[in-house]
A protein has these predicted regions:
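Flanking helices and flexible, charged tails adjoining ferredoxin-like Fe-S electron-transfer domains
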Residues: 1, 12-15, 19, 74-162
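Ferredoxin-type iron-sulfur electron-transfer modules and their immediate structural context
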Residues: 1-50, 108
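Catalytic cores of enzyme domains
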Residues: 1-3, 229-237, 242-249
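Fold-independent oxyanion-binding glycine-rich loops
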Residues: 6, 36-37, 64, 85-87, ...
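Iron-sulfur cluster-binding cysteine motifs and their immediate structural context
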Residues: 34, 43-91
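Generic secondary-structure signature for well-ordered alpha-helical cores
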Residues: 47-50, 121, 146, 187, ...
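Ferredoxin-type iron-sulfur electron-transfer modules in oxidoreductases and energy-metabolism complexes
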Residues: 52-61, 190-191, 195, 213-214, ...
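Cofactor-cradling patches in redox/metallo enzymes
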Residues: 139-141, 149, 155-239
């Protein structure tokens, strides 16, 4: 049986050596090509957006922190101005997820506070906290530890207690009943600590922003160091965002 399993493994041509580098699949985001002035600001794209991620009152603007990547805006545009382009991996500020014709998306290269990154070093313990998500982000977090993505090869691991954690990885829109638990979890972590908003709900509240939640995402409850957009962001994007934000390129 063991011999058969080994032959099956070899026949699949999987890499025998551990992978030291990780590349993320592109996450495509909607963006209006307004360079040639084709956008008439008819607001049809903004009207169909379920999370009000698009604003045409001034310059055509998309908020990647609100976007759920449904791409309904593309089909609604009568001039076919909106197209799919690769989305940035992360942002270190909320404003870093706002894009327009004068501020097009570019590859993420910012890092978290240097003092925090130097103290935490290359070993990152992560405490995942669900504040009321649909569990799509949790599925991706679970995959981060499997043999394929294997975040432990980069010195990352999920821990059960916030007292052992360096990073608080938060998902969900911060339901009111989770606010106190989130604050207690944050207070239990040793300093320095990093808070990461993973996914649209954690960043802005997403489709749940008008529900029984505390503010728009987790930023109204916790001080956020890193924003990772996506609905949900894939495992490799989360791992790669953490690596780059900690200055490990």
């Amino acid at each position: 049986m063991i011999r058969r399993s080994l032959l099956n493994f070899i026949s699949q041509k999987r890499p025998a050596e551990p992978q030291d580098e990780m590349g993320a699949r592109p996450l495509l985001m909607p963006f209006a090509n307004v360079v040639h002035g084709k956008c008439s600001k008819c607001s049809k794209c903004a009207d169909v957006c379920p999370t009000d991620a698009i604003d045409v009152s001034m310059e055509w603007t998309v908020d990647l922190g609100r976007c759920i990547f449904c791409m309904d805006c593309i089909g609604s545009c009568p001039a076919s101005v909106i197209e799919e382009i690769p989305a940035p991996l992360y942002a270190t500020s909320r404003d870093g997820l706002l894009f327009s014709g004068s501020k097009p998306p570019k590859e993420s290269n910012g890092t978290i506070d240097r003092a925090k990154a130097e103290i935490l070093g290359e070993s990152i313990a992560i405490r995942e906290l669900d504040t009321g998500s649909c569990n799509a982000c949790e599925v991706e977090v679970n995959c981060m530890s499997n043999p394929y993505y294997d975040m432990s090869r980069f010195g990352m691991k999920i821990v059960a207690s916030p007292r052992h954690a360096d990073v608080l990885l938060v998902t969900g829109p911060m339901a009111r009943n989770m606010r106190e638990a989130a604050l207690e979890t944050f207070d239990a972590m040793p300093s320095p600590k990093v808070v990461v908003a993973m996914g649209t709900c954690a960043i802005s509240g997403g489709i749940f922003v008008e529900g029984d939640v505390s503010g728009e995402g987790i930023k109204d409850t916790l001080e956020v160091d890193l924003y990772i957009p996506g609905c949900p962001p894939s495992p490799e994007r989360v791992v790669l965002a953490l690596l780059r934000a900690f200055g490990r390129n």
